Amino acid sequence: MSRSVKKGPYVDPKLLKKIVEMNKKNEKKVIKTWSRSSTIVPEMVGHTIAVHDGRKHVPVYITEAMVGHKLGEFAPTRTFHGHADTEKTSKVK
């Protein structure tokens, strides 16, 4: 179920404050955040946000196509290394 339109998108207030201040100063620095549930808003376009994946911060460059998605969608938390190989044994008949 999606969030109510009446409430608006959730964006971490501290993260949004940093973005707005950087837009006023016209500077682009990497911003570290643990807020994976924050929605990407148009003010974030062009910035690089380092999103925590549980182990490290993954840098995510925000583009216009990402607006409306969550930050956590672009920082995968699980690493898949493939299934275990079965040993190729020769069967003697």
From Swiss-Prot:
UniProt keyword terms in alphabetical order: Ribonucleoprotein, Ribosomal protein, RNA-binding, rRNA-binding
Q: Which GO terms describe its cellular component?
A: cytoplasm; small ribosomal subunit
Question: Which NCBIfam families does this chain map to?
Answer: rpsS_bact
Reported function: Protein S19 forms a complex with S13 that binds strongly to the 16S ribosomal RNA.
Quote the PANTHER family the UniProt record gives.
RIBOSOMAL PROTEIN S19P FAMILY MEMBER, SMALL RIBOSOMAL SUBUNIT PROTEIN US19M
Task: Report the family membership.
Answer: Belongs to the universal ribosomal protein uS19 family.
The name under which this protein is listed is: Small ribosomal subunit protein uS19
